[in-house]
Structure formats: C-alpha cells, structure tokens
C-alpha cells in the first residue's frame, strides 16, 4: 500500500513540476544578485543566468575563483557582470554587498541566496564559537541580505530565491548545528512570506530544498557518513532558476525530497527509515 501511495504521489509531483509555465525570456535583462558562486550549484546558477541574458552581480569568498566565473559569464553572453569578493561570516559585509549591487544595477529583480558555510559531519558536540560562525554564515547573513535588499525588491515586485537543504526540513544524524541554521532559514522565510502577503507586498519567496551539493567541500564534509550522491549542479541550478522565475513557493530537487518532507508528518516511521538508509551507520561519530 505504501509503495502504491508513493508511486501515485510521485506521478502527481512529476506532472506538477513538468508544467511550471517557465518563460526563459522573462529573465532577459533581469537584475540579479547571486551569492556563493565560486563552485557547484552557485557557479552553474551564474552560467544559466548569463545564458539567459540577465544582468549580474556575483559574490563569493575567494576572489580568484570569482574572477574565473565572471569571465565565463561574459563569454556566455551576460550583458553586465560585476563582482565583489565577500566573506559572509563578517556581520558588516552583507549590507555592503547589497549596496554594491544597487549601485551597479540601479535596483534588483532577484536576490538569490546560495552561499553556505559547511561543517564536518559526524560531530556530536561543537564549540559555541563554531556554532555562532555557522549561524552567521547560513542564517544571519541571509537575514541581513534580505533586509537590505527588500526595499528594492518591493519596488520592482521582485523575487527572493533561497537555496536551502533537506536538512532544513527533515532532521537527521550528525548535523545538528548546520541543520539548526537551515531550519531557522525555513522558519524565517516562511514567516516573512506571510508578513508580505498580509501587507500586500508583491515580493515572491521561493524556498529551494536541495540534496548534497555538487562541490568538493560539501562532499568532503560528509565523507564516510552518508551514501547520498551529490545532485548534478547544472540540473539542480536550472530547477532553482525555474522556481524563482515562476514565483513558486518551493522547489525540491531531486523531486523525491518533497515526498520525504511530507512523510515527516504523514508517516514518521517511514521517514525515519528513509533517512536511515542514507546514512553509513557503521561509521562512529567523532567525539
């Protein structure tokens, strides 16, 4: 019965995501501030936006990698590409990044929040200092960027696109500080969506629930802990862009993650079984 139910739900979700009315032309000339572009999905997001003719402000921590991505975006046809190297772990940086984007582009149509600070998996207890760093990188900087960009997005009736993780919806083992930051993201932006709706502010918020990032740092952080394979960067990035352009409230990639999130409430025992299958439980957690 469970298999039939999951199969039926899967077919419905596939049909839903297949017909999303995505119009690539809608992104031509769009003003986009994109964070975390030095590798993985962030880099692929930059390349997709460049091909679609968007005006870009790109940011990442490592300037040398950032410059390479900027050069590639120009080759792919982006009309305007600016960049600013920034460490989102510094509380004063997010506001400066948004102001730079506003100065260069004259406003924003999309704020795409993709940067992350990863922590090694398998650690039961982390120091308060490292946990504060994780919260600044993965939550507080998102709030700061949003707060600074919201007036411009309100003027343009734009969109907030938040790239998050399954760990912000479904708790799992060996990820407590990182998962806490991602749960905070989901709660903050879900509440903000309601506030904007009540105030009749036409700014869309798209929460993107992705799996393991297709980048070396993400894979290294969970080495020996999980059996999950990294999501292909180009495909995951396109799913994020489609969701943002169509003002969808949520994007799940791979799509089965939507089922897993539903199982959390509907079938908690089944959810726990699915999560357990993704773990290499023979690996002891670090002290």
From Swiss-Prot:
Keywords: Glycoprotein, NADP, Oxidoreductase, Secreted, Signal
Residues that bind substrate: 165
Annotated Gene Ontology cellular component terms: extracellular region; intracellular membrane-bounded organelle
Catalytic activity: cortisone + NADPH + H(+) = cortisol + NADP(+)
Sugar-bearing residue positions: 280
Signal peptide: 1-15
Active site (record annotation): 178
EC numbers: 1.1.1.-
Pfam families according to UniProt: adh_short
Binding-site residues, NADP(+): 36-62, 87-88, 114-116, 178-182, 211-217
Alphabetized InterPro entries for the sequence: 11-beta-HSD, NAD(P)-bd_dom_sf, Sc_DH/Rdtase_CS, SDR_fam
GO molecular function: oxidoreductase activity
Location in or out of the cell: Secreted
Function: Unidirectional NADP(+)-dependent cortisol dehydrogenase (in vitro).
Family stated for the protein in its record: Belongs to the short-chain dehydrogenases/reductases (SDR) family.
Name the UniProt record assigns to this protein: Hydroxysteroid 11-beta-dehydrogenase 1-like protein
Natural source organism: Bos taurus
Taxonomic placement: Eukaryota, Metazoa, Chordata, Craniata, Vertebrata
């Amino acid at each position: 019965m469970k298999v039939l139910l999951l199969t039926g739900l899967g077919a419905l979700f596939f049909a839903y995501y297949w017909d999303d009315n995505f119009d690539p032309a809608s992104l031509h000339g769009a003003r986009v501030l994109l964070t975390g572009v030095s590798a993985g999905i962030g880099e692929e997001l930059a390349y997709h936006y460049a091909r679609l003719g968007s005006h870009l402000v790109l940011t990442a921590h490592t300037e040398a990698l950032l410059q390479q991505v900027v050069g590639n975006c120009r080759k792919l046809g982006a009309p305007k590409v600016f960049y600013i190297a920034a460490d989102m772990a510094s509380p004063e940086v997010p506001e400066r990044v948004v102001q730079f984007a506003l100065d260069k582009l004259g406003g924003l149509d999309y704020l795409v929040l993709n940067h992350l600070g990863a922590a090694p998996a398998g650690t039961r207890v982390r120091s308060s200092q490292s946990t504060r760093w994780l919260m600044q990188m993965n939550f507080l900087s998102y709030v700061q960027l949003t707060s600074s960009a919201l007036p411009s997005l309100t003027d343009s009736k734009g969109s907030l696109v938040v790239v998050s993780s399954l760990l912000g919806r479904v708790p799992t083992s060996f990820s407590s500080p990182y998962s806490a930051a991602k749960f905070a993201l989901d709660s903050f932006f879900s509440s903000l969506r309601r506030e904007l709706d009540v105030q009749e502010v036409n700014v869309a918020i798209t929460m993107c629930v992705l799996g393991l990032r297709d980048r070396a740092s993400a894979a290294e952080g969970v080495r020996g802990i999980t059996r999950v394979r990294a999501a292909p960067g180009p495909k995951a990035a396109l799913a994020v862009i489609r969701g943002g352009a169509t003002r969808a409230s949520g994007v799940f990639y791979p799509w089965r993650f939507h089922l897993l999130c539903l199982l959390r409430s509907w079938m908690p025992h089944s959810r726990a079984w699915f999560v357990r299958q993704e773990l290499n439980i023979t690996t002891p957690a670090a002290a």
